[in-house]
């Protein structure tokens, strides 16, 4: 029996992702199938995570761990289909923030609003209220993503006009200044680990 190495499979996947086929997917049944596969694997991943938690609560730690392992497998399967749908690459963070903001906007302005109306019409008042409450959360998510996008586009993630307390999320070291340091002087982690120190407690 021929056993192929992970490297062989990775090289094969890279060749597929970089092929001309990617440009020809738009509007095809295969594109629709990739979208369905992504949705199915994403849903399975969440479901198995819930099952893992329940199995552990029921006293089945091994079964819980196997559900978690399978959930991680499904996550990776979903990533394959997601990347194929995006030309073989993960979009950049600004693109992802915009996509996330637009998705959250749809959820609170259209999807959950409509779901609440229909639930209320069918006599499910408590479910209608839940839809509305979750819609309010999605609105906050949209606002957060749009603020983060503005920070990325404006170069404000690691730099501000006034002095800030920049905290290393790895070791907790705090630096005061207009910019986060390129490297943490304590743990040597990169600038990407710094964030504005939060005092919301």
Could you tell me what each predicted segment is?
Residues 7-9:
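Short hydrophobic targeting helices and cationic amphipathic motifs
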Residues 21-201:
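Non-heme di-metal
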Residues 2-3:
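Short, small-residue-biased leader/transition segments that mark boundaries at the very start
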